[in-house]
From Swiss-Prot:
It holds the Pfam family UbiA. The gene is cyoE. PANTHER family: PROTOHEME IX FARNESYLTRANSFERASE, MITOCHONDRIAL. It is an enzyme of class 2 (transferase). It comes from Blochmanniella pennsylvanica (strain BPEN). This is Protoheme IX farnesyltransferase.
Length: 294
């Protein structure tokens, strides 16, 4: 039974978002790390994200039942966990999540977490996902909140660095989500979910992906130019970004194997975001001017 409650929180999504929260926190800390604050922020953020994922599972249970990728989820399989239990579980996770965030004594992190949860559950999952091809753009804001929460927990302010993290992670979400939409095109058709590839076509979606990858590249450059990361960070992430962009352009040469290309783009987007989070976390420790001189 415990494993079903764990599955309901989408642990992979929670873990990925915690990596970005850690990256945001550590880049704002600039080496002066408060470990108690870090742990409190991580636990609180994890619980709030888990709550959002449970609520998303509750809202999407009807479409999950008809999609090949999601038909084995806990709420689709009758008898594993009941609906009222799931709702209670989500509420408890949310309460304890915000309780932990209150221990940071940083009201900003609570506000940002509440905004992210509201956008993901109320605006994206409950409303826009079934109605608009632009739902992922709104959803990308909630997906970009964890690094901003981590940053603001350490910096205790929403400054240009927090804004740049919001932009960077929002831009990454679009090509990542589009690659899933192409890869699972038939799934979304069966569930009547209006995705960009279904409504505008795969070729138009490829254009969209390339534009957002270019925007992502520019944003990561600006983040370094503004003094938040080292130039070694910029060199490493730029090499990876150009690889991603190259693969995006390669999609124009694909005619009959869009799903295979989309799978490669999806996996590459994961490599990019994991690398970005690791670089953000380690940048001040490994690549700061002080450490290089030493």
């Amino acid at each position: 039974m415990i494993k079903y409650y764990l599955y309901l929180t989408k642990p992979g999504i929670v873990l990925g978002n915690l990596m970005s929260s850690a990256g945001g926190f550590l880049i704002a800390s600039r080496g002066a790390i408060s470990y108690s604050l870090f742990i409190t922020m991580i636990v609180g953020t994890a619980l709030v994200i888990a709550s959002g994922c449970v609520l998303n599972n509750i809202i999407d249970r009807d479409i999950d039942a008809v999609m090949e990728r999601t038909k084995h989820r806990v709420l689709v399989q009758h008898g594993q966990i009941f609906l009222n239990q799931s709702i209670f579980y989500a509420v408890i996770l949310s309460i304890f999540g915000f309780l932990f965030l209150s221990f940071t004594k940083n009201v900003l992190t609570i506000y940002l977490s509440a905004i992210g949860l509201f956008i993901y559950v109320g605006v994206y999952s409950l409303w826009m996902k079934r109605r608009s091809i632009y739902s992922i753009m709104v959803g990308s804001i909630s997906g970009a909140m964890p690094p901003v929460i981590g940053y603001c927990a350490a910096a205790n302010q929403f400054d240009a660095g927090a804004l740049m993290l919001l932009i960077i992670f929002s831009l990454w979400q679009i090509p990542h989500s589009h690659s899933i939409a192409i890869l699972r095109l038939n799934d979304y058709k069966v569930a009547f979910i209006p995705t960009f590839p279904i409504k505008k076509g795969v070729e138009s979606t490829k254009n969209h992906m390339v534009v957002y990858i270019i925007g992502f590249i520019i944003a990561t450059i600006l983040f370094t130019v503004m003094g938040y990361t080292s130039y070694i960070f910029l060199i490493i992430i730029s090499i990876m970004n150009l690889w991603w962009l190259h693969m995006g352009f390669y999609g124009y040469r694909i005619i009959n194997h869009d799903s295979l290309w989309a799978k490669k783009m999806f996996l590459l987007s994961l490599i990019i975001i994991i690398s970005l989070n690791l670089l953000l976390s380690l940048d001040h420790i490994l690549f700061s001017t002080k450490n290089i001189l030493l």
